[in-house]
UniProtKB/Swiss-Prot annotation:
Pfam families: Hexapep_GlmU (PF24894), NTP_transferase (PF00483)
Residue ranges crossing the lipid bilayer per the database entry: none
Protein name in the entry: Glucose-1-phosphate adenylyltransferase
Family stated for the protein in its record: Belongs to the bacterial/plant glucose-1-phosphate adenylyltransferase family.
PROSITE patterns linked: ADP_GLC_PYROPHOSPH_1 (PS00808), ADP_GLC_PYROPHOSPH_2 (PS00809), ADP_GLC_PYROPHOSPH_3 (PS00810)
Nucleotidyltransferase among keywords: yes
Subunit structure, as described in the record: Homotetramer.
UniProt source species: Streptococcus gordonii (strain Challis / ATCC 35105 / BCRC 15272 / CH1 / DL1 / V288)
EC number: 2.7.7.27
One GO biological process term: glycogen biosynthetic process
Amino acid sequence: MKNEMLALILAGGQGTRLGKLTQSIAKPAVQFGGRYRIIDFALSNCANSGIHNVGVITQYQPLALNSHIGNGSSWGLDGINTGVSILQPYSASEGNRWFEGTSHAIFQNIDYIDSINPEYVLILSGDHIYKMDYDDMLQSHKDNNASLTVAVLDVPLKEASRFGIMNTDANNRIVEFEEKPENPKSTKASMGIYIFDWQRLRNMLVVAEKSNVDMSDFGKNVIPNYLESGESVYAYEFAGYWKDVGTVESLWEANMEYINPENALDSRNRRWKIYSRNLISPPNFLSENAKVEDSLVVDGCFVDGTVKHSILSTGAQVRKDAVIEDSVIMSGAIIGQGAKIKRAIIGEGAIIAEGVEIDGTEEVFVVGYNEKVGVPKDED
Protein backbone atom coordinates (compact mmCIF):
# COMPACT_ATOMS: atom_id res chain seq x y z
CA MET A 1 0.00 0.00 0.00
CA LYS A 2 1.29 3.45 -0.90
CA ASN A 3 1.61 5.98 1.92
CA GLU A 4 1.30 9.65 1.04
CA MET A 5 4.19 11.13 2.99
CA LEU A 6 7.01 9.84 5.18
CA ALA A 7 8.87 12.21 7.50
CA LEU A 8 12.61 11.76 7.98
CA ILE A 9 14.18 13.69 10.86
CA LEU A 10 17.93 14.29 10.62
CA ALA A 11 19.04 13.91 14.24
CA GLY A 12 22.65 12.78 14.03
CA GLY A 13 24.40 16.08 14.53
CA GLN A 14 27.07 16.45 17.19
CA GLY A 15 26.31 20.08 17.94
CA THR A 16 29.88 21.09 18.72
CA ARG A 17 28.91 24.75 19.15
CA LEU A 18 26.87 23.76 22.22
CA GLY A 19 30.11 22.72 23.90
CA LYS A 20 29.71 20.77 27.13
CA LEU A 21 25.97 20.31 26.61
CA THR A 22 26.56 17.83 23.78
CA GLN A 23 29.64 15.97 25.00
CA SER A 24 27.48 13.01 26.03
CA ILE A 25 24.27 13.42 24.02
CA ALA A 26 23.21 14.40 20.50
CA LYS A 27 22.02 17.97 19.98
CA PRO A 28 18.36 17.01 19.34
CA ALA A 29 18.32 15.34 22.79
CA VAL A 30 19.31 18.54 24.63
CA GLN A 31 16.60 19.75 27.00
CA PHE A 32 14.50 22.82 26.28
CA GLY A 33 11.86 24.78 28.17
CA GLY A 34 11.93 22.69 31.33
CA ARG A 35 10.11 19.57 30.13
CA TYR A 36 11.04 19.04 26.48
CA ARG A 37 13.95 17.93 24.34
CA ILE A 38 14.64 19.78 21.12
CA ILE A 39 13.49 16.92 18.88
CA ASP A 40 10.04 17.03 20.51
CA PHE A 41 9.11 19.96 18.28
CA ALA A 42 9.70 18.15 14.99
CA LEU A 43 8.02 14.98 16.30
CA SER A 44 5.01 16.93 17.62
CA ASN A 45 4.69 18.83 14.34
CA CYS A 46 4.56 15.47 12.55
CA ALA A 47 1.89 14.15 14.92
CA ASN A 48 -0.19 17.33 14.68
CA SER A 49 0.14 17.36 10.87
CA GLY A 50 -1.30 13.85 10.58
CA ILE A 51 1.95 12.17 9.50
CA HIS A 52 1.81 8.52 10.54
CA ASN A 53 5.30 7.26 9.72
CA VAL A 54 8.49 8.93 10.93
CA GLY A 55 12.10 7.85 10.59
CA VAL A 56 14.65 9.42 12.95
CA ILE A 57 18.16 9.28 11.49
CA THR A 58 20.78 9.25 14.24
CA GLN A 59 24.55 8.97 14.38
CA TYR A 60 26.37 10.85 17.18
CA GLN A 61 25.76 9.71 20.80
CA PRO A 62 22.27 8.26 20.08
CA LEU A 63 21.58 6.50 23.40
CA ALA A 64 19.69 9.30 25.20
CA LEU A 65 17.77 10.16 22.04
CA ASN A 66 16.76 6.54 21.39
CA SER A 67 15.62 6.14 24.99
CA HIS A 68 13.62 9.35 24.84
CA ILE A 69 11.78 8.45 21.63
CA GLY A 70 11.14 4.82 22.59
CA ASN A 71 8.26 3.35 20.59
CA GLY A 72 6.83 6.77 19.74
CA SER A 73 3.81 6.45 22.03
CA SER A 74 4.30 9.94 23.49
CA TRP A 75 3.52 11.35 20.04
CA GLY A 76 0.81 8.84 19.12
CA LEU A 77 3.16 7.09 16.70
CA ASP A 78 2.68 3.57 18.03
CA GLY A 79 -0.58 2.54 16.38
CA ILE A 80 -1.36 -0.26 13.93
CA ASN A 81 -0.69 1.87 10.86
CA THR A 82 1.73 4.34 12.43
CA GLY A 83 5.28 4.10 13.65
CA VAL A 84 8.58 5.76 14.44
CA SER A 85 11.82 4.05 13.44
CA ILE A 86 15.32 4.84 14.70
CA LEU A 87 17.73 4.68 11.76
CA GLN A 88 21.46 4.40 12.47
CA PRO A 89 24.49 3.81 10.21
CA TYR A 90 24.99 0.12 9.56
CA SER A 91 27.41 -2.27 7.92
CA ALA A 92 26.54 -3.18 4.33
CA SER A 93 28.24 -5.48 1.81
CA GLU A 94 30.27 -2.50 0.59
CA GLY A 95 31.63 -1.92 4.12
CA ASN A 96 30.98 0.38 7.05
CA ARG A 97 29.93 3.92 6.14
CA TRP A 98 29.08 6.82 8.37
CA PHE A 99 26.61 9.31 6.99
CA GLU A 100 28.66 11.82 4.99
CA GLY A 101 26.00 14.51 4.71
CA THR A 102 22.28 15.21 4.89
CA SER A 103 21.24 13.63 1.59
CA HIS A 104 23.75 10.79 1.99
CA ALA A 105 21.88 9.86 5.17
CA ILE A 106 18.73 9.56 3.05
CA PHE A 107 20.49 7.46 0.42
CA GLN A 108 21.79 5.06 3.07
CA ASN A 109 18.20 4.45 4.18
CA ILE A 110 16.63 3.83 0.78
CA ASP A 111 15.56 0.30 1.76
CA TYR A 112 13.66 1.61 4.79
CA ILE A 113 11.99 4.36 2.74
CA ASP A 114 10.99 1.90 0.02
CA SER A 115 9.41 -0.34 2.67
CA ILE A 116 7.08 2.54 3.61
CA ASN A 117 6.47 3.27 -0.11
CA PRO A 118 5.71 7.00 0.20
CA GLU A 119 4.71 9.31 -2.62
CA TYR A 120 6.49 12.19 -0.89
CA VAL A 121 9.28 12.46 1.66
CA LEU A 122 9.48 15.30 4.17
CA ILE A 123 13.04 16.03 5.31
CA LEU A 124 13.38 17.75 8.69
CA SER A 125 16.11 18.89 11.02
CA GLY A 126 15.82 17.61 14.57
CA ASP A 127 17.40 20.65 16.21
CA HIS A 128 15.09 23.62 15.61
CA ILE A 129 12.39 25.12 17.85
CA TYR A 130 9.16 25.91 15.97
CA LYS A 131 5.57 24.90 15.24
CA MET A 132 4.57 24.18 11.66
CA ASP A 133 1.74 22.48 9.78
CA TYR A 134 3.51 20.22 7.31
CA ASP A 135 0.19 19.31 5.69
CA ASP A 136 -0.20 22.92 4.54
CA MET A 137 3.29 22.78 3.03
CA LEU A 138 2.39 19.52 1.26
CA GLN A 139 -0.71 21.13 -0.22
CA SER A 140 1.43 23.97 -1.56
CA HIS A 141 3.80 21.37 -3.06
CA LYS A 142 0.88 19.70 -4.84
CA ASP A 143 -0.69 22.96 -6.03
CA ASN A 144 2.60 23.99 -7.64
CA ASN A 145 3.16 20.53 -9.13
CA ALA A 146 6.63 20.81 -7.64
CA SER A 147 9.43 18.27 -7.61
CA LEU A 148 10.88 19.93 -4.53
CA THR A 149 9.50 22.47 -2.07
CA VAL A 150 11.80 24.29 0.35
CA ALA A 151 10.44 25.99 3.48
CA VAL A 152 11.86 29.50 3.73
CA LEU A 153 11.94 32.21 6.36
CA ASP A 154 12.64 35.89 5.86
CA VAL A 155 15.75 36.81 7.87
CA PRO A 156 17.58 40.11 8.46
CA LEU A 157 20.06 40.83 5.67
CA LYS A 158 22.96 40.91 8.14
CA GLU A 159 22.20 37.28 9.11
CA ALA A 160 21.49 35.95 5.62
CA SER A 161 25.06 34.75 5.00
CA ARG A 162 24.53 32.06 7.68
CA PHE A 163 21.87 30.30 5.59
CA GLY A 164 21.13 28.85 2.21
CA ILE A 165 19.53 31.79 0.39
CA MET A 166 16.97 31.62 -2.42
CA ASN A 167 15.90 34.01 -5.14
CA THR A 168 12.36 33.44 -6.40
CA ASP A 169 10.12 34.70 -9.19
CA ALA A 170 6.65 36.23 -8.73
CA ASN A 171 5.13 32.75 -8.29
CA ASN A 172 7.64 31.71 -5.59
CA ARG A 173 9.45 29.39 -7.96
CA ILE A 174 13.11 29.24 -6.95
CA VAL A 175 15.37 30.49 -9.72
CA GLU A 176 18.65 30.68 -7.82
CA PHE A 177 20.07 29.10 -4.67
CA GLU A 178 23.28 30.06 -2.84
CA GLU A 179 24.63 28.15 0.14
CA LYS A 180 25.78 30.67 2.81
CA PRO A 181 26.74 33.44 0.35
CA GLU A 182 29.13 36.22 1.41
CA ASN A 183 26.96 38.82 -0.36
CA PRO A 184 23.37 37.52 -0.28
CA LYS A 185 21.00 38.75 -2.98
CA SER A 186 17.89 37.88 -0.99
CA THR A 187 16.69 37.38 2.57
CA LYS A 188 14.71 34.20 1.91
CA ALA A 189 16.56 31.62 3.99
CA SER A 190 16.19 27.85 3.87
CA MET A 191 14.83 26.34 7.09
CA GLY A 192 16.27 22.92 6.24
CA ILE A 193 12.75 21.59 5.65
CA TYR A 194 12.10 19.95 2.27
CA ILE A 195 9.35 18.00 0.54
CA PHE A 196 10.51 15.82 -2.36
CA ASP A 197 8.67 13.56 -4.77
CA TRP A 198 10.31 10.37 -3.56
CA GLN A 199 10.85 8.57 -6.87
CA ARG A 200 12.56 11.60 -8.43
CA LEU A 201 14.86 12.07 -5.44
CA ARG A 202 15.55 8.34 -5.24
CA ASN A 203 16.51 8.10 -8.89
CA MET A 204 18.87 11.07 -8.62
CA LEU A 205 20.63 9.70 -5.53
CA VAL A 206 21.04 6.22 -7.04
CA VAL A 207 22.42 7.55 -10.34
CA ALA A 208 24.81 9.87 -8.48
CA GLU A 209 26.12 7.00 -6.34
CA LYS A 210 26.69 4.76 -9.36
CA SER A 211 28.41 7.60 -11.22
CA ASN A 212 30.53 8.53 -8.21
CA VAL A 213 29.05 12.06 -8.24
CA ASP A 214 28.96 13.87 -4.90
CA MET A 215 25.32 14.33 -3.86
CA SER A 216 25.92 14.06 -0.12
CA ASP A 217 24.36 17.36 0.97
CA PHE A 218 20.99 18.94 0.16
CA GLY A 219 22.19 22.54 0.26
CA LYS A 220 25.54 22.10 -1.46
CA ASN A 221 24.62 19.44 -4.00
CA VAL A 222 21.00 18.36 -4.37
CA ILE A 223 19.17 21.69 -4.61
CA PRO A 224 21.67 23.16 -7.12
CA ASN A 225 21.37 19.94 -9.17
CA TYR A 226 17.57 20.18 -9.22
CA LEU A 227 17.76 23.78 -10.45
CA GLU A 228 20.36 22.99 -13.11
CA SER A 229 18.21 20.07 -14.31
CA GLY A 230 15.17 22.33 -14.74
CA GLU A 231 13.11 20.63 -12.03
CA SER A 232 10.21 22.62 -10.59
CA VAL A 233 11.52 23.89 -7.25
CA TYR A 234 9.32 26.16 -5.13
CA ALA A 235 9.61 28.09 -1.89
CA TYR A 236 7.05 27.71 0.88
CA GLU A 237 7.05 30.87 3.00
CA PHE A 238 6.81 30.44 6.77
CA ALA A 239 6.06 33.44 8.99
CA GLY A 240 5.88 31.87 12.45
CA TYR A 241 8.41 31.52 15.26
CA TRP A 242 11.51 29.50 14.30
CA LYS A 243 14.75 29.30 16.22
CA ASP A 244 18.02 27.63 15.31
CA VAL A 245 19.41 26.69 18.74
CA GLY A 246 22.79 25.54 17.51
CA THR A 247 24.82 27.83 19.79
CA VAL A 248 24.86 28.31 23.56
CA GLU A 249 23.71 31.91 23.18
CA SER A 250 20.78 31.04 20.89
CA LEU A 251 19.70 28.14 23.12
CA TRP A 252 19.76 30.37 26.20
CA GLU A 253 17.92 33.13 24.33
CA ALA A 254 15.18 30.76 23.12
CA ASN A 255 14.66 29.48 26.67
CA MET A 256 14.40 33.03 28.02
CA GLU A 257 11.83 33.88 25.33
CA TYR A 258 9.88 30.76 26.25
CA ILE A 259 9.38 31.98 29.83
CA ASN A 260 7.05 34.73 28.61
CA PRO A 261 3.48 33.33 28.77
CA GLU A 262 2.68 35.26 25.58
CA ASN A 263 5.75 33.91 23.78
CA ALA A 264 5.85 33.87 19.99
CA LEU A 265 5.95 30.07 20.04
CA ASP A 266 2.39 30.16 21.43
CA SER A 267 3.22 27.39 23.88
CA ARG A 268 -0.20 27.44 25.55
CA ASN A 269 -2.12 26.76 22.34
CA ARG A 270 -4.03 23.53 23.03
CA ARG A 271 -4.81 23.04 19.34
CA TRP A 272 -1.14 22.45 18.53
CA LYS A 273 0.43 20.78 21.53
CA ILE A 274 4.08 19.93 21.96
CA TYR A 275 4.34 16.38 23.28
CA SER A 276 7.22 14.76 25.10
CA ARG A 277 8.20 11.66 27.04
CA ASN A 278 7.64 12.79 30.59
CA LEU A 279 8.35 10.49 33.49
CA ILE A 280 6.06 10.71 36.50
CA SER A 281 7.58 13.00 39.14
CA PRO A 282 6.42 14.04 42.61
CA PRO A 283 4.88 17.50 43.10
CA ASN A 284 7.09 20.54 43.49
CA PHE A 285 8.12 21.66 46.95
CA LEU A 286 8.52 25.36 47.66
CA SER A 287 9.68 26.09 51.20
CA GLU A 288 8.74 29.12 53.27
CA ASN A 289 12.09 30.61 52.19
CA ALA A 290 11.38 30.13 48.49
CA LYS A 291 10.97 33.17 46.27
CA VAL A 292 10.00 32.46 42.68
CA GLU A 293 9.40 35.29 40.20
CA ASP A 294 8.62 35.20 36.48
CA SER A 295 9.88 31.63 36.12
CA LEU A 296 8.90 28.17 34.91
CA VAL A 297 9.15 25.44 37.54
CA VAL A 298 8.47 21.91 36.30
CA ASP A 299 7.36 18.83 38.29
CA GLY A 300 9.54 17.37 41.01
CA CYS A 301 11.55 20.50 41.84
CA PHE A 302 12.71 21.44 45.35
CA VAL A 303 13.09 25.19 45.95
CA ASP A 304 14.44 26.66 49.17
CA GLY A 305 16.09 29.71 47.60
CA THR A 306 15.37 32.51 45.11
CA VAL A 307 14.54 31.99 41.44
CA LYS A 308 14.10 34.95 39.07
CA HIS A 309 13.27 34.78 35.36
CA SER A 310 14.61 31.25 35.04
CA ILE A 311 13.60 27.71 34.13
CA LEU A 312 13.82 24.81 36.58
CA SER A 313 13.53 21.49 34.76
CA THR A 314 12.16 18.26 36.22
CA GLY A 315 13.70 17.35 39.58
CA ALA A 316 16.01 20.37 39.86
CA GLN A 317 16.97 21.47 43.39
CA VAL A 318 17.71 24.98 44.65
CA ARG A 319 19.02 24.87 48.21
CA LYS A 320 18.65 27.50 50.95
CA ASP A 321 19.88 31.04 50.16
CA ALA A 322 20.83 30.08 46.60
CA VAL A 323 19.92 32.67 43.96
CA ILE A 324 19.14 31.77 40.34
CA GLU A 325 18.66 34.57 37.81
CA ASP A 326 18.17 34.50 34.01
CA SER A 327 19.26 30.86 33.87
CA VAL A 328 18.23 27.39 32.73
CA ILE A 329 18.62 24.60 35.29
CA MET A 330 18.20 21.23 33.60
CA SER A 331 16.75 18.04 35.06
CA GLY A 332 18.22 16.70 38.28
CA ALA A 333 20.73 19.52 38.69
CA ILE A 334 21.47 20.61 42.27
CA ILE A 335 22.31 24.20 43.19
CA GLY A 336 24.00 24.21 46.59
CA GLN A 337 23.25 26.42 49.58
CA GLY A 338 24.16 30.06 49.04
CA ALA A 339 25.27 29.55 45.42
CA LYS A 340 24.70 32.41 42.98
CA ILE A 341 23.88 31.60 39.35
CA LYS A 342 23.34 34.32 36.74
CA ARG A 343 22.84 33.96 32.98
CA ALA A 344 23.87 30.33 32.79
CA ILE A 345 22.79 26.92 31.51
CA ILE A 346 23.33 24.17 34.07
CA GLY A 347 23.28 20.71 32.47
CA GLU A 348 21.37 17.62 33.52
CA GLY A 349 22.54 16.08 36.78
CA ALA A 350 25.13 18.79 37.41
CA ILE A 351 26.05 19.76 40.97
CA ILE A 352 26.98 23.31 41.97
CA ALA A 353 28.56 23.26 45.41
CA GLU A 354 27.70 25.47 48.35
CA GLY A 355 28.66 29.13 47.92
CA VAL A 356 29.82 28.87 44.29
CA GLU A 357 29.21 31.98 42.18
CA ILE A 358 28.66 31.74 38.43
CA ASP A 359 28.24 34.93 36.39
CA GLY A 360 27.57 34.66 32.65
CA THR A 361 26.98 38.37 32.10
CA GLU A 362 29.69 38.63 29.46
CA GLU A 363 29.07 35.19 27.92
CA VAL A 364 26.46 32.58 28.84
CA PHE A 365 28.13 30.19 31.30
CA VAL A 366 27.66 26.46 30.68
CA VAL A 367 27.98 23.58 33.13
CA GLY A 368 27.95 20.21 31.40
CA TYR A 369 26.02 16.98 31.83
CA ASN A 370 26.71 15.54 35.34
CA GLU A 371 29.54 18.06 35.82
CA LYS A 372 30.49 19.07 39.38
CA VAL A 373 31.55 22.64 40.15
CA GLY A 374 33.25 23.42 43.45
CA VAL A 375 32.77 19.89 44.78
CA PRO A 376 35.93 18.59 46.57
CA LYS A 377 37.46 15.59 44.80
CA ASP A 378 37.10 13.39 47.86
CA GLU A 379 33.33 14.00 47.65
CA ASP A 380 33.21 13.54 43.88
